[in-house]
Amino acid sequence: MAEEKRIISVFFVILQSLIYTVFAMDERLDKVKVQCDYLPLINFAIQQNGASIIHQLSIENTTPAPLKDIQVQITTEPTFGNAAPIAVAQIPPNESICLSSFNLTLSANYFTQLTERLSGNLKIEITSEAESVFCQTYPIDILAYDQWGGLNVLPEMLAAFITPNHTAIVPIIKRAASILGQWTDNPSLDEYQSRTPDRVRKQMAAIYTAITEQQIIYSTIPASFEEYGQRVRLADSVMAQKLGTCLDMALLYASCLEAIGLNALIIITQGRSEERRV
């Protein structure tokens, strides 16, 4: 089917991501000014998708002499990642350099075991000819493995919570095929192969009906969840607990749609979520 004719399930408008920009100067040393642009939070989804925590690091030499043999070391507190030092040959007097590539490796094992939100730090140390010229910590929130960060920071990471290969949705898919067979005499979940919009709509409706039969109870969302995010129940938790917020249910529906080959798009609207189709 031509791309423009595809039917996409739309649940939730993704807003611009927030990046912290922090200007700092170590008053004890008074040799460099540093501007650090970084994400104010991190979670397992960000780690798995390889998103960069530090977007840019600008270092200005405020002295009348060049700074030579510079080493930039980034560490984390607690130890959720590690990075090799960055070497800079020199910064001329009263000039600056901008770094945008950081070999910061995040630990998948650390994030998968994190069940509660923590407060942490990024620590940046700069030396010139083995002499310290800057040392500063930058606060960062470390989210639980099943926690979405909200709209302010990489909202597109919500897509990481769509799990079309989860075994918990298999009963829903099977039931949807049965419902589709009752409606059309053809139980095949054949995504866009029919090249018929009505067939696609019926598959979507069958999935929706199968989910409603699960008798999942609505659970209210936290206040201001669009900005600050929330814990997400994945498909197995929704099915086992028979509880779900509007976000949990939207992710479950999107997971089922993707499992049968239909394209799903998640959008966030202000206030409670609602289903839309385009």
Model-found features: residue ranges?
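Asparagine-centered strand-capping/turn motif at beta-strand->loop junctions
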Residues: L57-T63
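Low-complexity, acidic Ser/Thr/Pro/Gly-rich terminal tails and inter-domain linkers that flank the onset
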Residues: M25-A51, E77-T79
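Short acidic/proline- and small/hydrophobic-mixed sequence motifs that coincide with surface turns
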Residues: P64-D69
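Intrinsically disordered, low-complexity Pro/Gly/Ser/Thr-rich segments with frequent PxxP/GP/PP motifs
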Residues: T75-T115
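Conserved small/polar residues in nucleotide/adenosyl-binding loops
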Residues: R276-V278
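Terminal connector regions
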Residues: S100, L104-N152
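Secondary-structure boundary elements
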Residues: A168-A240
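Short, solvent-exposed loop/turn segments enriched in Ser/Thr/Gly
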Residues: N49-Q56, L118-N121
